[in-house]
Amino acid sequence: MINTNTLARPYAKAAFEFASAAQQADAWLNMLSLSAAAVQTPAVAQQLVNPALTDEQKVNVLAQICAGHIDASFSNFLRSLGSNDRLSLLPVVREQFAVLKAEAERALDVEVESAFELNAEQLQTLAAALSKRLDRTVQPKPVVNPALIGGVVIRAGDLVIDGSVRGKLNKLAEALKS
């Protein structure tokens, strides 16, 4: 079976290139978010797999749901997806579009896992330090995990910084076993 990421990638890339050239990346991300949410609702998902409907009818169903929130160029994009029976890929296309947009803006979502809830000042200080280290704009996403005991674990893309007490105890245990 073909990976949905592989199928969605060219659509996301084409959409991002078009939206960037038209300086409409934010608007396209909003339209992709709306249409992706629509295709994930059970009623719409059922219509998209209905063999009695043509590809054009499926696109029209989605376009009617999103009417007033999508423009003509996005409607054409939906028709392109529909003609290739790829409307169900919209959530993955949206996800990949968001990644491309973040890369272009040099922005990065960073998961900050801590034992206790961090206040706004702590998150801001952490974001500033990470922005300097990673040379990107950082958007911290706080996650509370009491199992860490103390400290934080930071996940930024492929980078993981484990400054938790649990992580240090695990390293100490490994050193003692050696």
Swiss-Prot record:
Intracellular or extracellular location(s): Cell inner membrane
Domain of life per record: Bacteria
Membrane topology listed for this record: Peripheral membrane protein
Record keywords: ATP synthesis, Cell inner membrane, Cell membrane, CF(1), Hydrogen ion transport, Ion transport, Membrane, Transport
GO molecular function: proton-transporting ATP synthase activity, rotational mechanism
Signal peptide range in chain numbering: none
Family under the similarity heading: Belongs to the ATPase delta chain family.
Subunit structure: F-type ATPases have 2 components, F(1) - the catalytic core - and F(0) - the membrane proton channel. F(1) has five subunits: alpha(3), beta(3), gamma(1), delta(1), epsilon(1). F(0) has three main subunits: a(1), b(2) and c(10-14). The alpha and beta chains form an alternating ring which encloses part of the gamma chain. F(1) is attached to F(0) by a central stalk formed by the gamma and epsilon chains, while a peripheral stalk is formed by the delta and b chains.
Name of this protein: ATP synthase subunit delta
Species whose genome carries this gene: Ectopseudomonas mendocina (strain ymp) (Pseudomonas mendocina)
